[in-house]
Amino acid sequence: RAVPGAGLRVPIWLLGSSLFSAQLAGQLGLPYAFASHFAPELLLEALALYRRNFTPSDRLAAPHAMAVLNVFAAETDAEGVRLATSMQQSFARLSTGKPGRLPPPVDDIAAVLTPQQIESARSRLTYSAVGGPETVQKQLSDFIALTQVDELMITGMMFDKAARIRSLEIV
């Protein structure tokens, strides 16, 4: 019984990136978090399925949803776009079976990726907030309006640790 949370009713969430996880969370009456930061194509359908299948439980009376969102915030829109190129390159590498360390950002993504790789990476980053403070704030507000989520979880894989910290400060 050396569990730190024993007897504290620590909230249990179901985190998923599929329709099955959404349906299961709803049926079990659990809060649901969707991994839209890497699996955006099912986000809206998963949230609708979760809410439609929600059964109240002793832990939760109504649906409570969260979505994970990529954020690349910087002082300017151009710098936010540049910071996001690390993830674009990373997704391109994953799609070709060549994962590795997160690459540094580049000024011209078209110089390092093919048009098909750029499109594939952009589709994986559909739900991202990228740019300067005002742009990112609007994109976050638009995302919340679109999804009606109760909470956001933010991630932002950036090559430069200081840029990542600054991005979080901006948000």
Regions found by a protein language model. Name each.
Residues 21-22, 41-42, 74-76, 160-163:
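Flexible loop/turn segments at secondary-structure boundaries
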Residues 1-28, 41-45:
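Internal, glycine-rich beta/alpha segment that forms the wall or movable "lid"
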Residues 144-170:
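Generic C-terminus detector
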Residues 28-31, 146:
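Catalytic domains of carbohydrate-active enzymes, especially glycoside hydrolases
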Residues 11-15, 32-35, 63-70, 150-154:
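Hydrophobic faces of well-ordered beta-strands that scaffold small-molecule active sites
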Residues 18, 38, 71, 158:
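Residue-level signal for short, function-critical loop segments
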Residues 1, 41-148:
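An alpha-helical appendage that flanks or caps ligand/catalytic pockets
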